[in-house]
UniProtKB/Swiss-Prot annotation:
A motif ('HIGH' region) lies at residues 11-21. It catalyses: tRNA(Glu) + L-glutamate + ATP = L-glutamyl-tRNA(Glu) + AMP + diphosphate. Belongs to the class-I aminoacyl-tRNA synthetase family. Glutamate--tRNA ligase type 1 subfamily. It comes from Leuconostoc citreum (strain KM20). One of its GO terms (biological process) is glutamyl-tRNA aminoacylation. GO terms for molecular function: ATP binding; glutamate-tRNA ligase activity; tRNA binding; zinc ion binding. This is Glutamate--tRNA ligase. It is found in: Cytoplasm. Catalyzes the attachment of glutamate to tRNA(Glu) in a two-step reaction: glutamate is first activated by ATP to form Glu-AMP and then transferred to the acceptor end of tRNA(Glu).
């Protein structure tokens, strides 16, 4: 592309950063960065009743956590600010364009009450008509319409401003993702509100003014905005402005139900900060989200944000719905944890502090030992960092109960022989014995007693760790405190073998 690319991510601060919104932001960022364009963040806060106090903060902090940067935003203003719609409204940016449409007869003031609107909808339903707004000034001249305005104003009524929909027109565009789309003006539900009674512009009006004034070249957003596009095209055309290119990404569906991902789906965590709190890695989240509705060439599935940027191709955005597969996210996150183990080690150790397995002081003083424990336990079996707690809890920080199955191994004739041989071998090994030393000692017992497999390994593991399975035993023995292991073995002998 040779044109100047300017794209925007424009969230409403009515909630925290949702997976779907994160995908919109990521793909806009990729589009901008791949083509050396600009990525703008604009806050669409016109619905003040639904805005939450930390909604904007959550959006920006979590976007930054994902590794995204931006060229313009409320906190990084450029020449096209302000970047909050509420502030733009306070500065009177929208009103001249409302007035222009009113003056040209392309919009009008409507004083209908909610009761009148409800009555009209009921009548339409009774007549089996599609819901639509009924124009109340049919046949009136501009002067007669102005007189009606004055009459309503005298009664203390506050109007909304509605755009006069050209009913016979069809709005068509070549969607970046979905291809050619046509929607008839009649499908938008009649004349629609562009300014509320409190003077605040509605979303579909404000977004057009903002996109034009901020020189947005491409609008890449979710499939649920397709129905908004003809309304926005109406305003672009009415004001004589160029229309940006639109692209509507496929829905994200619940991988289990096959239905659109809903905030009511309690089986799926849907907000980025929830995954962040569990210890998912930002690279993994970007990797997973970047594959929701977009496919690279080849079979590889592990990509960094930089790799995504280099190979991004908007023509590979899928028309088919994207399946949210929790298991795949867990697999991708595990791949990134294994790849970046040294980098995330402080985070893993902090999980142990949070779970009260170690004190903050020991987390620092024993950092090397804790890192050894984590490496021996292995992150291969966990999906996110918080799971490291249960992985290392036993036997590194506490011992589990000895079960009847374990007792059977210990008290069998072979088990007693293995225990006695292992006790002697372990005591004889030096404190700095290596994993190879421990393995050779166990092999020596195998050769001496001619016992192998579970009948050899289980009595040793039970006597040492109170477990029948777990990480590599010789490697565990290297990091376990020898005095502690000797006490564990003494207790086992006293309780079960005397």
């Amino acid at each position: 592309m040779t044109e100047d690319i300017r794209v925007r991510y424009a969230p409403s601060p009515t909630g925290h950063l949702h997976i779907g919104n994160a995908r919109t932001a990521i793909f806009n960022w990729l589009f901008a960065r791949h083509y050396n364009g600009k990525f703008i963040i604009r806050i669409e806060d016109t619905d003040s009743a639904r805005n939450i106090a930390d909604g904007e903060k959550s959006q920006l902090e979590n976007l930054a956590w994902l590794g995204l940067d931006w060229d313009e935003s409320p906190e990084k203003p450029g020449e096209y600010g302000p970047y909050r719609q509420s502030e733009r409204n306070e500065q009177g940016i929208y009103q001249p364009f409302i007035d222009k449409l009113l003056t040209e007869g392309l919009a009008y003031k409507s004083y209908k009450t909610s009761e009148q609107l409800a009555s009209e909808r009921e009548a339409q339903q009774a007549a089996k008509q599609a819901p639509h707004y009924v124009y109340e000034y049919e046949g009136l001249t501009r002067e007669e319409r102005e007189a009606k305005y004055a009459e309503f104003e005298a009664k203390g009524l506050k109007p909304v401003v509605r755009f006069r929909v050209p009913e016979e027109k069809t709005y068509a565009w070549d969607d970046i993702v979905k291809g050619h789309i046509e929607i008839g003006a009649k499908e938008v539900g009649g004349d629609w509100v562009i300014q509320k009674a409190d003077g605040m512009p509605t979303y579909n009006f404000a977004v057009v003014v903002d996109d034009h004034m901020m020189k947005i070249s491409h609008v890449l957003r979710g499939d649920d905005h397709v129905s908004n596009t003809p309304k926005q095209m109406m305003i672009f055309e009415a004001l004589g402005w160029d229309i940006p290119q639109f692209g509507h990404m496929a829905l994200i569906i619940n991988g289990e139900t096959g239905k659109k991902l809903s905030k009511r789906d309690e089986n799926v965590l849907q907000f980025v900060e929830q995954y962040k709190a569990l210890g998912y890695q930002p690279q993994a989240m970007v990797n997973f989200i970047g594959l929701l509705g977009w496919s690279p060439k080849g079979e590889d599935e592990i990509f960094s944000l930089e790799e995504f940027k280099q190979m991004f191709d908007e023509t590979r955005l899928s028309k088919a719905n994207a399946k949210f597969d929790q298991k795949k996210l867990e697999w991708i996150n595990n791949q990134w944890m294994r790849r970046d183990l040294e980098e995330i080690m402080p985070q893993l150790i902090q999980e142990l502090v949070t779970a009260n397995l170690v004190s903050p002081a020991d987390a620092t003083a024993k950092a090397d030992w804790l890192a050894q424990v984590i490496k021996v336990a292995g992150v291969e079996g966990i999906s996110y960092t918080r799971e490291i707690v249960d992985l290392v809890r036993q036997p590194f920080f506490e011992l589990g109960d000895i079960t009847d199955e374990m007792v059977a191994y210990l008290t069998s004739e072979e088990g007693r022989r293995v225990f006695d041989a292992w006790e002697s071998a372990y005591i004889a090994l030096p404190d700095d014995a290596t994993a190879e030393d421990y393995l050779n000692a166990i092999r020596g017992i195998q050769n001496q007693l001619e016992i192998k497999g579970r009948n050899l390994w289980n009595p040793i593991r039970i006597a040492t760790t109170h477990e029948v399975q777990g990480p590599n035993l010789p490697e565990m023995l290297v990091v376990l405190d020898k005095a502690t292991v000797l006490q564990t073995m003494a207790d086992v002998k006293s309780n079960y073998l005397n």
